[in-house]
Amino acid sequence: MSLPNPAELISQMAIRLKAHLEHRGISDPRYIGIRTGGVWVAQALLEALGSQSPLGTLDVSFYRDDFSQNGLHPQVRPSALPFEIEGQHLVLIDDVLMSGRTIRAAMNELFDYGRPASVTLVCLLDLDAAELPIRPNVVGATLTLAAHERVKLSGPSPLQLELQDLAL
């Protein structure tokens, strides 16, 4: 399977995100990337949009419902939100949507900071394997993988996708 080019996806996503926000009447959203890949995608997306907006970052490690199974990530970093959440329109950005658990954890953390007016979800890839009813508003590409396959984003410059075979 050949994987799409992240730079091309981000260019397309910027166009779709701009149209989505205009359709909803949102002119000054707050952008938040989920560590680590979502931050890289968010930085590239802001550049593609020509936006000087500050970028918030979330580390959702403590909010995940599966760290008893997977263990705590060895490099937990604090979240950094240089703006208010209460009443704001947020654009939440992640690299790969698989189970939906990272997004659920991010939403839980965001609501600890306040009640946003809206949350628009943007993902570089949707692996069409959600375990929770979570779907992105803007997505670069949707892929269907075998159960033993995963996609990993490396970066930040350049952003590259790699197909990993867990069966090997």
Curated annotation (Swiss-Prot):
The keyword Manganese does not apply. It holds the Pfam family Pribosyltran. Disulfide bonds: none annotated. InterPro entries: PRibTrfase_dom, PRTase-like, PyrR, PyrR_bifunctional. It catalyses: UMP + diphosphate = 5-phospho-alpha-D-ribose 1-diphosphate + uracil. GO terms for molecular function: uracil phosphoribosyltransferase activity. One of its GO terms (biological process) is regulation of DNA-templated transcription. Keywords: Glycosyltransferase, Transcription, Transcription regulation, Transferase. Substrate binds at T36, G37, R77, D94, D95, V96, L97, M98, S99, G100, R101, T102, V151. Coiled coil: none annotated. A motif (PRPP-binding) lies at residues 90-102. Its EC number is 2.4.2.9. NCBIfam families: PRK05205.1-1. Belongs to the purine/pyrimidine phosphoribosyltransferase family. PyrR subfamily. Regulates the transcription of the pyrimidine nucleotide (pyr) operon in response to exogenous pyrimidines. Also displays a weak uracil phosphoribosyltransferase activity which is not physiologically significant. This is Bifunctional protein PyrR. It comes from Pseudomonas fluorescens.
